[in-house]
From Swiss-Prot:
Protein family according to the UniProt entry: Belongs to the CarA family.
Cited HAMAP family: CPSase_S_chain
Name this polypeptide is given: Carbamoyl phosphate synthase small chain
GO biological process, one term: L-arginine biosynthetic process
Species lineage: Bacteria, Pseudomonadati, Pseudomonadota, Gammaproteobacteria, Lysobacterales
Keyword ATP-binding: yes
Organism encoding this protein: Xanthomonas axonopodis pv. citri (strain 306)
Active site per the UniProt annotation: C282 (nucleophile), H366, E368
Residue runs in coiled coils: none
EC code: 6.3.5.5
UniProt binding sites for L-glutamine: S47, G254, G256, L283, Q286, N324, G326, F327
Annotated gene: carA
Length: 391
């Protein structure tokens, strides 16, 4: 027997449907994602912490879930909003259906609502705070909860979703033929620069990755390029990172507002001063810009999808990218030593920067995809090239 569920927005709009997840009450910022596939990767992306994800594609759950496609060890999204959930998933890799997967992880979710109407409302008014309630329904209680939610502006969530302890990562991408993950340096890119003299062996690049909410596929793409990755908590002092003598430092994706992350901004300033090769993605991109002296701004609806066109301003190439962010770098505030490398063809917002006086660059979207295209994957190779040039 199905349980009732409601979505209540801060403006008083109420959507009634049925529960396809856990019972209870959850609050957060309601956003929409336009990707047709990859719902598991979306839900397990830590960048969605304190956000409720509306998936605009009508049928969600067709291919079920498999543990191999998780992008984090925990679900940080505040809830899921969909139009329809197929009764029976069909895929040779599927281990469990959507409702069972959500219930096991305690995620509140609603189906059977008009997601087109909701998406148009969010597009017109901007991201809304909302409350999802499943099981025992109380509209007034849900509305009160939605209006009490403070919103993401000014909210530092990187320290919330970050790992609590340092760990090492050497696992590459998934090989479906062998049903296993590739090992360190599987792509054999750029490692010759680190061949030990006379040994005939190629050594991996030592990369320290600041975890602000890192996706696992980012770590895999670094590993298969010959990077021996040490993942550290978001608030790790930069002195501890430099003591590891890394060839490069990676700044991960993550949720929330970048401006309150003073600990990260201060650390990145020192990395810039020390000329350490540095590569940032998503939140890491915004933090690099802040460390360089720029400012960020809250977007009306943000970018959430897997089909966003971005232009590489250096070569003129247009790439289709995966995007997931609600804040953006304000190009008008970039200092003279920072040049723009990429720009969105949807709304003209900044998508990439590079410092002219330090080996540091960043990209707003997700070159690791998961889900989405890998048109921007060569940025990982650029990071390897920076480290090789410094060796």
């Amino acid at each position: 027997m199905t349980q009732p569920a409601i979505l209540v927005l801060e403006d008083g709009t109420v959507f009634e449907g049925e529960s396809v997840g856990a019972n209870g009450l959850s609050v957060g910022e309601v956003v929409f994602n336009t990707a047709m596939t990859g719902y598991q990767e979306v839900l397990t992306d830590p960048s969605y912490a304190r956000q409720m994800v509306t998936l605009t594609y009508p049928h969600i759950g067709n291919t079920g879930f498999t543990d191999q496609d998780d992008e984090a060890r925990k679900i940080w999204a505040a809830g899921l909003i969909v139009r329809d959930v197929p009764r029976r998933p069909s895929n040779w890799r599927s281990q469990v259906a959507l409702p069972e997967w959500l219930q096991a992880r305690g995620v509140v979710a609603i189906s059977g609502i008009d997601t087109r109407k909701l998406t148009r409302l969010l597009r017109q008014k901007g991201a809304q705070n909302g409350a999802l309630m499943a099981g025992d329904i109380d509209v007034e209680k849900a509305l009160e909860a939605a209006r009490k939610f403070p919103g993401l502006k000014g909210m530092d969530l990187a320290k919330v979703v970050s790992t609590e302890s340092t760990y090492n990562w050497k696992e590459g991408s998934l090989d479906l033929n062998s049903d296993s993950f590739l090992g360190l340096g599987a792509l054999n890119i750029g490692k010759s620069a680190h061949a030990s003299a006379g040994s005939g062996e190629e050594l991996a690049f030592k990369v320290v990755a600041y975890d602000y909410g890192v996706k696992l596929n980012i770590l895999r793409m670094l590993a298969e390029r010959g990077c021996d990755v040490t993942v550290v908590p978001a608030r790790t002092p930069v002195a501890e990172v430099l003591a590891l003598q890394p060839d490069g430092v990676f700044l991960s994706n993550g949720p929330g507002d970048p401006e309150p992350c003073d600990y990260a901004i201060d650390a990145i300033k020192e990395l810039i001063a020390q000329k350490v090769p540095t590569f940032g993605i998503c939140l890491g991109h915004q933090l690099l810009a802040l460390a360089a002296g720029a400012k960020t701004l809250k977007m009306t609806t943000g970018h959430h999808g897997a089909n966003h066109p971005v232009q590489d301003l250096d070569g003129g190439r247009v790439m289709i990218t995966s995007q997931n962010h609600g804040f953006a770098v304000d190009e008008s505030t970039l200092p003279a030593n920072v040049r723009v490398t990429h720009r969105s063809l949807f709304d003209g917002t900044n998508q990439g920067i590079a410092l002219t006086d330090a080996p540091a660059f960043s990209f707003q979207g997700h070159p690791e995809a998961s889900p989405g295209p890998r048109d921007v994957g060569p940025l990982f190779d650029r990071f390897v090239d920076l480290m090789a040039a410094r060796a």
